[in-house]
Amino acid sequence: MTVESPPSDAEFDASQDQAPPACVMSFNASDATGAGGSAGDVATIAAMGAHALPVVASIVMRDTAEVFDHHPIDADVIAEQARSILEDVTISAWKVGFLGSAEGVSAVAEILSDYPDVPLVAYMPNLSWVEDDEQQSYLDAFRELVLPQTEVLVGSHQTLTDFLLPDWDNERPASARELAVAAGEHGTRHVLVTSVMLPAANSPDQYMDNILASPQGAITGEKFERFEVSFVGAGDTLSAALAALLGAGTDLHSAVGEALAFLDQSLDAGFRPGMGNVIPDRFFWALSSDEEDGEGEEDDDDGNGGDDDGDVDPDTDSDTDADADADSGDDSGPEPTDTPGAVTPPKVLRHIH
């Protein structure tokens, strides 16, 4: 029996007719629910056609309903995780989520500063579950060390208002531009503000806006109808998707639209694995055509046409407002292939590969 030797490195490299995917390093907490944190980042970045390099900054104890506790990783261990892979792999973008402690923020910020040309998407989750003193030191460190390096700061309207304009006492809510101005004072170039409440004209329903803004004004955004559905992991999904798109070279305006469309479809396909909140399904596009047709028939039989394209307030622990937008997502399903059962990502994502 003849045993063929594996290809050499040179032969393997020559056989690759496509460039490798964009590599995105994520700094985030470990979340055993798989809804957010590093697990959510890995799933989202992979679903977007990029490759995730997850660095764990904290261990969060939670279920799908609430956070119980967290244990920050030692700052030196965070740095060693990142430096080890950065010496080997070229990265295209950063995603920063919950970093566990002020010391963790400092360690990550020092690493980011060594790569000023790599775009950084920073997500500010709802940290109301963290002790007040610990929360304040964390936010102060994040404001001083991470914001100056941030291309896009992502967060819900309420969370970003509390973070950027803690003394806001105007009866009207702060605008996205005002939040961008406040972030810009610390060096952040853009904010992506989600869950901006809007009254619907001549309707008792409420709508939410998602707005990308700079200190000069609003740039782009999408309005979605609000639904009372609780999600967890939406904010990490949106910010990780945006980081993957920027890492792949997509311009910011287009990347925000595609990231919002991806979140919209992920939430529409979301599932409830336990007794708590709904988790986004980042691989909604991996459903085969036959399964899609079958589900559509079942929906029609039930009288529910499946038009609940959802989007949500993307806070890590308080995703309580889902919003729907029938026009925001790319509703083209997986294209036919020559291989039975094979599927491809939705068209909105396909240019990454």
Stretches found by the model and what they are:
Residues 132-219:
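Conserved phosphate/ATP/ADP-binding segment of small-molecule kinases
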Residues 49-53, 218-220, 245-259:
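Phosphate-handling active-site elements
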Residues 3-4, 18-21, 72, 253-302, ...:
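Charged C-terminal helix
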Residues 3-26, 38, 42-129, 136, ...:
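Conserved N-terminal subdomain of the carbohydrate kinase-like
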Residues 44, 162, 229-252, 256:
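Short, small-residue alpha-helix embedded
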Residues 12-21, 37, 205-221:
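Acidic-glycine-rich active-site phosphate/pyrophosphate-binding loop
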Residues 27-33, 219-232:
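Short pre-catalytic strand/loop immediately N-terminal to key active-site residues, enriched for Gly-Thr
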